[in-house]
Amino acid sequence: MSIQTPEQLIDRLANDLAWRKKELSAMKSLIEAKNVSDKRHKVLLRSGVCILYSHWEGFVKLAANSYLEYVISQKLTYQKLSSNFLALAMKEKLKKAKETHKASLYIPVCEFFISELNQRSILPKPKDVISTGSNLNSEILKEITYILGIDFSIYSTKSPLINTQLLKTRNEIAHGEDSVFDRDEYLELHRDIIGMLDIFRNQIENAAIQKKFRRDSP
């Protein structure tokens, strides 16, 4: 079912984040358990980092795609879209013109800006826009926030955590390296990632409620 109201968007985000938090909570409980061998505890920590990353990437992608789906469902004209979404709509037109190096292909682009802004907008499908490449680092997150028109500065101080503690460690584990990660490091990482997921969810919900996708939003 397509998302056509802020309430539907909020419900989708709430339901998705709920099961992710439940699974992460279960993993955290296993890692905090005292009655496990050091060998098993190491396995749990390595598994925990991988699961933590999967939910970080999974929720950001779902939330971003869901918001874009909601914006598309509003069927706004180009002139009513905020700058970030207008840029997204124009991306393919400009890309085709640039790739051919033919000046003639810029003529339709110019005509669009002159006479077609009052037409109903056509935005690309969410799956063609939001891509993490299975490596959701801080730069990719920044690009996603720019596409959606939400604030990245909240995450800027978390870049080392995202890029090194989470992504680099997860990649090392996934590639079979014997990375060392202790309980306290994991628990701190768990808290920080849960916090960022909540922030991202709130940003998406607020953007929808406040109609930040519209040029005339307050």
Regions found by a protein language model. Give the residues of each.
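Residue-level signature of transmembrane alpha-helix interfaces in integral membrane proteins
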Residues: E32, Y70-Q74, D192
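Helix-loop junctions and short alpha-helical segments
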Residues: I51-L52, F59, A64-Y155
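Short, flexible helix-adjacent loops and helix caps
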Residues: K28-V36, A64, L68, D178
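A generic "cationic amphipathic patch" detector
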Residues: A33, K61, L68, R183-Y186, ...
